[in-house]
Amino acid sequence: MARSVYLASVDRDAVKSIVAVGLIEELKRSYERVGVFRPVLRRADGRDHVLDLLKTRDTIEADREVREGTTYKHFDEAPDAAMQLVLDRYEAFKKLCDVVVVVGSDHTDVPGGEELSLNARIAANLGTPMLVVLPGSRLTPAQLIASAELATKTIEAKHASVIGVVANRCPTTTIAAVRAALGKLDVATAAVP
């Protein structure tokens, strides 16, 4: 059975795709078959610049259709059918992999805090723990802790679990303080420039 991790962010400024690249590269040191799956896409025509980037980094030879779940529109119109389609496609894709990096949606089509909730619901249904990526470039250490705690509550309310928190794009002037603050959380943490 494939191992997996679900990357999600609290907003688009977190730039989780950079974290995904680093995670994929690290996983390739330990696993032969590392794959990337996108459960929610903005467009039905298959254009997704994040997936296009990340599939060049993984080790799975598979068409993009195998790596995709469904669209925001499908979730809006038929949420149960959309979730089932994501589950079916994920189950088929993970058979090709030793480990799957699931890269959540990009805060483009779901209003407010609903996007993290959607990602948490998907992660819970996939049985995949979540790695939360925070925007370290514009939040103070105290704000990052508050954001991490709120994200964790939101995720756990949807019956998913958090295995770690990453503050991405932290200024070098605050990175030590961010690391110290995040270190108080009960999950693995990292702060990266």
Each model region followed by its residue ranges:
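Loop/turn-to-beta-strand initiation segments
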Residues: 33, 96-102, 129
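Conserved catalytic-core segment of NTP-binding enzymes
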Residues: 105-189
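N-terminal phosphate/diphosphate-binding loop that engages ATP/GTP or pyrophosphate donors
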Residues: 2-96, 111-112, 141
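Extended hydrophobic/aromatic-rich secondary-structure runs
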Residues: 1-18, 122-123, 133, 153-158
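A structural preference for short, hydrophobic beta-strand core positions in alpha/beta folds
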Residues: 36, 191-192
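Residues in well-ordered beta-strands of folded domains
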Residues: 8, 166, 193
